[in-house]
């Protein structure tokens, strides 16, 4: 029992997941917005009419996310699955980055307290919080030269929401740049394998949807609100976001912080160049900010050793002083 109480499970996972569960219990009656629509589409995907799931151009979710929603179905249960799942993924990613128990506990509780886990359910778009965390994990694997696994994970993130493909720049963190192409190929195959069945067996109209530029966005300052914004412009938006991420990846590849700065760059450019603006878009930046803060705080003792050892050093100096002269 004593060993268990000293373990990271008892010191980190239990309190964070308990806090997330407590928040989820309060959210059971919350209206989760688009999540209701996604659940219905998920139920269709798991039915005999699965081939027509993406016949509605409005549906921009990935098939893996729909499978999860359709399988669980119950919104109260989804509150627990999504909120605890988001908290657990954050702790897992921080653990892979070598963050200690104390900082992981603080980051996990901050995620619950700041609303990251709660809004992952209540806003109805949990992928906004989950996808960037998967990118960070893929970046860690890419730095370890595990490009196949990294490409696979990025492809899986696109199965939640298609913009997950934008995580490709983290593949440039591999020690051998030529292998980044292998990871990108794996990512492409995974994405294609998820979407092809719907295109071959039914009507795949996801790419027929057009957005309209809204006021309050950067694009709204350049073009008139209401201007159509279709998939060709989405590809331009994606290219700019991924290009910026690639620049950060190649110029900062030696820094540990690159594993979250590349995803953050992509996320921020994606949001700033988007034709519409929703509050849940910023969940991605919040998740990455928690990862970055934990890494920065972990480095502080090594960067400022005097601050860490100041009191002890002062004690040693006083102890080393010569004794007073007695008359």
Language model features with spans:
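Primarily membrane-embedded glycan-assembly and transfer machineries that use lipid-linked glycans
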Residues: 1-139, 175-282, 293, 297-299, ...
């Amino acid at each position: 029992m004593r060993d268990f109480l000293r373990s990271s499970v008892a010191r980190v996972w239990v309190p964070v997941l308990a806090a997330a569960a407590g928040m989820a219990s309060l959210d059971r009656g919350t209206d989760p917005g688009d999540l209701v629509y996604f659940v219905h589409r998920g139920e269709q995907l798991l039915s005999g009419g699965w081939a027509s799931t993406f016949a509605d151009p409005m549906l921009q979710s990935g098939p893996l996310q729909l499978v999860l929603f359709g399988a669980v179905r119950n919104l109260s249960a989804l509150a627990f699955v999504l909120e605890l799942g988001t908290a657990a993924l954050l702790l897992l990613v921080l653990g892979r980055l070598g963050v200690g128990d104390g900082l992981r506990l603080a980051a996990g509780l901050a995620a619950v307290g700041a609303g990251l886990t709660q809004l992952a359910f209540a806003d109805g778009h949990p992928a906004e919080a989950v996808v960037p965390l998967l990118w960070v994990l893929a970046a860690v694997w890419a730095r370890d030269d595990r490009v196949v696994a990294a490409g696979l994970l990025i492809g899986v993130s696109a199965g939640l929401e298609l913009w997950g493909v934008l995580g490709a720049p983290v593949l440039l963190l591999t020690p051998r740049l030529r292998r980044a192409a292998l990871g990108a190929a794996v990512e492409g195959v995974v994405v294609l394998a998820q979407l092809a069945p719907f295109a071959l067996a039914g009507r795949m109209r996801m790419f027929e949807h057009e957005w309209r530029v809204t006021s309050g966005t950067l694009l709204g300052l350049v073009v008139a609100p209401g201007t159509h914004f279709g998939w060709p412009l989405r590809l331009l938006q994606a290219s700019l976001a991924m290009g910026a991420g690639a620049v950060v990846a190649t110029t900062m590849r030696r820094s540990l912080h690159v594993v979250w700065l590349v995803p953050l760059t992509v996320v921020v450019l994606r949001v700033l160049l988007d034709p519409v603006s929703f509050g849940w878009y910023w969940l991605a930046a919040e998740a990455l900010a928690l990862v970055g803060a934990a890494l920065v705080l972990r480095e502080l003792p090594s960067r400022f050793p005097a601050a860490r050892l100041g009191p002890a050093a002062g004690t040693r100096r006083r102890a080393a002083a010569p004794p007073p002269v007695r008359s």
